[in-house]
């Protein structure tokens, strides 16, 4: 029987449940391939609305299912090389987690017993739009946490909102060091489960100093926003320490992000005297630049140091310029597929190729790594909580300063009060193997995280300008 009090509450709530259906309609429009996932989230969305209006929802709901919001580029220039592989890696790892198919130590079903639902949504549109999206996912859908974010600009925009809304957020990919060095110096809810851009620049400088010590200089072409600026700054400062004989140009090229056309910049690079060219281009910008540069013989005249070229390697195939120094922002993508022989990498690579018909790249690994970080933290917290579903504070405590195994590398949450990940790194030279029919890397050097990341408590610029004291490179 339903008493009068309950009837009154239901009469108040039911008209408002249109909020849920409207939100799901918008989600389905964002990515029609995700319809079945969106529809399965209806129960969770209703629970969030009921809770908002003061109707108690049993703990069993939370234990049975958790919802992770996963932002990535589904449209625009960031989608083909970054966003879609990130989405694919997310879908693969979550499906396997729910079925208990991930190799040890993640071979239990679900996350702390809960099946995982993912709301994968479009990161395109800029910072203001993404702040709105973030608020909507928390306040209207009641998601448990976020895992993802490709763009440094997006991370810079949503960091304060994540702390304001007290929502656990694991940055999987965005690279700017500013997140914890300037924007959120005492983070609670925000984590990053991989190294930041300083590691890329320092590892590359070590590689250049070792392999290209006789080069006459270096210049750069980088996107004119946080990621590009930080990438060039850190590489340039590291070169001043590790290879002061190789001089950097002050006349680098700074096109806006997603510019798409680089005729003037390519002309300037062809005229520049420096042997080496640094670029942190990614996504559609990287591929457009490569095609335009190939047409003008740019890669035959300069040696390119490409910190994110690993994302484009399999897409470009034979058209990937031979001889570029290729980065994948860690031991991900081509480095893991070719060089890391562990049960986890073998499983992930085989499952990804079987499902999507292509090799997993850097963002596929990084997004899966963030999801594994969530599984690790929730299950560690649940174990400490007597097997009960943990609170957000308990999950945070479990992840702070912890070490967990990603798909391709160990992740140590060892910087920024235990919120910034530290991982190993790799650099090598790319070419195309005709027999394999795949791009490969050779002359590879590996770098430990403590060699290429600032010690805890020291910001990147201070560390680099001070001669990188405390780096452990033995």
Each language-model region and where it sits:
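Periplasmic-binding protein-like
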Residues: 70, 137-150, 168-172, 218-222, ...
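Extracytoplasmic "Venus flytrap"
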Residues: 69-93, 121-127, 150-151, 221-229, ...
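Extracellular/periplasmic Venus flytrap/periplasmic-binding protein
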Residues: 129-132, 177-178, 186-296, 338-340, ...
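Extracellular/periplasmic ligand-binding modules, especially the Venus flytrap/periplasmic-binding
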Residues: 283-288, 336-402
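Bacterial N-terminal signal peptides that target proteins for export
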Residues: 35-45
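C-terminal segment of classical bacterial N-terminal signal peptides
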Residues: 49-60
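Solvent-exposed, acidic/polar segments of extracytosolic/periplasmic ligand-binding ectodomains
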Residues: 66, 322, 402-474
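Beta-alpha junction/loop-to-helix N-cap segments that form part of ligand/metal-binding clefts
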Residues: 63-67, 81-85, 100-181, 193, ...
């Amino acid at each position: 029987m339903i008493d009068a009090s309950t009837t009154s509450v239901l009469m108040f709530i039911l008209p408002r449940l249109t909020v849920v259906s409207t939100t799901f309609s918008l989600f389905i429009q964002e990515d029609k391939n995700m319809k079945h996932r969106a529809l399965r989230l209806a129960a969770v969305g209703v629970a969030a609305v009921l809770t908002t209006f003061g109707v108690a929802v049993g703990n069993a709901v939370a234990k049975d299912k958790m919802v992770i919001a996963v932002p990535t580029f589904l449209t625009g220039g960031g989608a083909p090389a970054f966003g879609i592989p990130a989405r694919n890696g997310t879908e693969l790892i979550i499906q396997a987690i729910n079925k208990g198919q991930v190799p040890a130590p993640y071979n239990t079903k679900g996350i702390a017993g809960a099946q995982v639902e993912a709301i994968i949504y479009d990161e395109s549109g800029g910072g203001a739009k993404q702040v709105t999206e973030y608020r909507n996912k928390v306040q209207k859908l009641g998601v448990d946490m976020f895992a993802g974010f490709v763009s440094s600009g997006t991370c810079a925009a949503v960091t304060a909102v994540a702390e304001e809304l007290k929502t656990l957020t694991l940055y999987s990919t965005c690279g700017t060091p500013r997140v914890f060095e300037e924007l959120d110096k005492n983070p609670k809810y925000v984590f990053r489960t991989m190294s930041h851009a300083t590691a890329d620049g320092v590892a590359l400088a070590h590689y250049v100093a070792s392999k290209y010590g006789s080069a006459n200089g270096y210049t750069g072409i980088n996107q004119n926003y946080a990621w590009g600026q930080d990438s060039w700054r850190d590489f340039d400062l590291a070169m001043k320490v590790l290879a002061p004989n190789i001089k950097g140009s002050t006349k680098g090229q700074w096109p806006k992000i997603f510019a798409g056309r680089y005729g003037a910049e390519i002309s300037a690079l062809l005229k520049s005297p420096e042997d080496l060219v640094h670029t942190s281009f990614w996504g559609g910008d990287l591929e457009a630049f490569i095609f335009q540069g190939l047409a003008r013989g740019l890669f035959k005249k300069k040696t390119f140091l490409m910190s994110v070229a690993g994302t484009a390697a399999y897409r470009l195939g034979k058209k990937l310029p031979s001889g570029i120094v290729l980065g994948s922002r860690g031991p991900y993508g081509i480095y893991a597929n070719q060089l890391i022989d562990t049960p986890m990498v073998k499983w992930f690579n085989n499952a990804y190729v079987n499902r999507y018909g292509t090799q997993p790249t850097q963002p596929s690994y990084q997004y899966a790594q963030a999801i594994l970080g969530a599984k690790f933290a929730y299950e560690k917290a649940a174990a400490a909580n007597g097997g009960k579903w943990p609170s957000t504070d308990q999950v945070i405590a479990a992840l702070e300063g912890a070490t967990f195994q990603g798909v391709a590398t160990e992740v140590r949450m060892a910087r920024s009060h235990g919120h910034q990940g530290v991982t190993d790194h790799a650099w090598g030279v790319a070419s195309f193997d005709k027999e394999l029919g795949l791009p490969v890397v050779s002359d590879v050097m590996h770098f430990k995280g403590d060699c290429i990341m600032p010690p805890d408590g020291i910001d990147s610029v201070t560390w680099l300008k001070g001669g990188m004291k405390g780096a452990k490179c033995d």
